[in-house]
């Protein structure tokens, strides 16, 4: 169940070690980098105005039981930052997957799964390709979206 709160004050909302899975999509860009969004809510969502990778992983560490899993998506240029911070908080990166729009394109996102208290071993999985050359979803993306994909491709063309 999604819960909206300030993750920097997560202890005010939840007890420590109360979850076996935590997922996060933290802001991608440090403040004062790239083109900052004009709207305040978009700026907060995209830039590390209110939280950063360290805040996100620290909150996940607090929430996770020993052996619990942490999943996060982020931009490839922040990969080293994310993996370093995960290890700093004893969440060992276990699976890594890059995401690209079409085959043979540079990834625009990565998905990482870590396990609290685990031993080192990172498995890099095949790249997740979103679209076929004709612009339609790949079979794997159709599996991900399921019935939500019905008619979506026609709306974006």
Question: Which residue stretches match the model-derived regions?
Answer:
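Mobile active-site "lid"/loop adjacent to the S-adenosyl-L-methionine
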Residues: 20-21, 26-55
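Short, glycine/acidic-enriched loop or turn micro-motifs at the edges of active sites
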Residues: 9, 28, 116
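SAM/dcSAM-binding transferase cores
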Residues: 106-157
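Glycine/Thr-rich phosphate-binding loops of Rossmann-like dinucleotide-binding domains
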Residues: 11, 32, 80
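Conserved SAM-binding strand-loop segment of SAM-dependent methyltransferases
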Residues: 1-12
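Glycine-rich phosphate-binding loop signature in dinucleotide/nucleotide-binding domains
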Residues: 13-17
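Conserved Class I SAM-dependent methyltransferase catalytic core
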Residues: 49-107, 111
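Structural signature of beta-strand start/N-cap positions in the alpha/beta core
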Residues: 1, 18-20
